[in-house]
Amino acid sequence: MPSRYARIGDRIISIGHVTDREAGNAAAQPVGHGANHSKTGAGAEMITIPQLTAQALGSFLAQETKGRFVASQAGLTELLPFAAKLTLECIGNSDALYHDIEHTMLVTLVGHDILVGRALARATTADDYANFIMACLAHDIGYVRGVVQGDEDDAFVADLSGRKVRLPIGSSDAALAPYHVDRSKLFVIERLDAVEEVDAARIARAIEYTRFPYVTTPKEDADDLNEEEGLLLRAADLIGQLGDPNYMRKSNALFYEFEEIGLNKTLGYATPADIVYRFPQFYWTNVAPQIQLAIRYLNVTSSGRQWIANLHSNVFRAEREVNLSGPQR
């Protein structure tokens, strides 16, 4: 069943799932007054969850850009909705169980809050904001089969050299996990490099920092802008996942993505419950050192502090074995 999203104030949130009947009823209702909707046969235009999410997130980003950077780069208010539509509707075609439009949306929202805090703490331009948000939107698009030039029905581009890999029969997009960072960088270069306001190389450099295992040791004060952007994107990726209020109940989806590439055996996960059991240790050992700069920026605003609270709440629940949702333990 697809997820249902709602907008409350200036936030976009997941509010559970819609049934097929609810989705059908929603698709049959007009959206707004006086809107022109194309018809397919006797029915109204089909409305999809990726489409609705892209529209809502794009509008939110455009409004925020206009409000915070009104004196510069007005064209960015049109660019970000375009980028949201392009990336989210592509990711909406993915069959990966965890790395879906909701994950990308959450990473983008926490990335927004990180940059808002950064803008209050130090000089941040409209270009800084827009290119960082586009890196959030595109950081996992490499999971999707068919989005990179050179992809074929049975062979997919694996790296920047153009090398291709064939996936086992029955594979989902999750099987491209070992290659998704390079594929995401290729997508950005192929699709966005010609857009005047976009620095595709800058976005690709930031996406490289999401490659796991991490090779860059974070510094408390990152003076180099490229390094700081990369570290903040890495943090947004981690906080968007681990600070998700519904993270625990997504452990099953994450487990079976890991299973597809043999990562569970490497990590020692026998069941989805192991992801929850080992989450506190993973957080304090592997995650906390990577996100301190982002935490500093998030702590500047109330919405940023909510992400910190969500993150620590999930750690607390796993440590105290609060079994309110998620895999049976």
Protein language model features and the residues they cover:
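An active-site-proximal "capping" alpha-helix that borders the catalytic cofactor pocket
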Residues: 107-108, 177-193
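Non-catalytic interface/linker regions that flank or bridge core catalytic/transmembrane domains
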Residues: 5-20, 24, 30-82, 86-96, ...
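Divalent metal-dependent phosphate-bond-processing catalytic cores, especially two-metal-ion Mg2+/Mn2+ enzymes
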Residues: 34, 38-67, 113-128, 138, ...
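Short alpha-helical scaffolding segments that buttress acidic/His motifs in well-ordered protein cores
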Residues: 83-90, 132-136, 203-211, 232-236
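Alpha-helical phosphate/pyrophosphate-handling elements in metalloenzyme active cores
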Residues: 93-131
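Active-site flanking loop/helix segments enriched in acidic
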Residues: 82-109, 166-174
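Post-HEXXH active-site segment of zinc metalloproteases
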Residues: 147-170
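Hydrophobic/aromatic-rich structural module bridging two neighboring secondary-structure elements via a short loop
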Residues: 126-137, 168-176
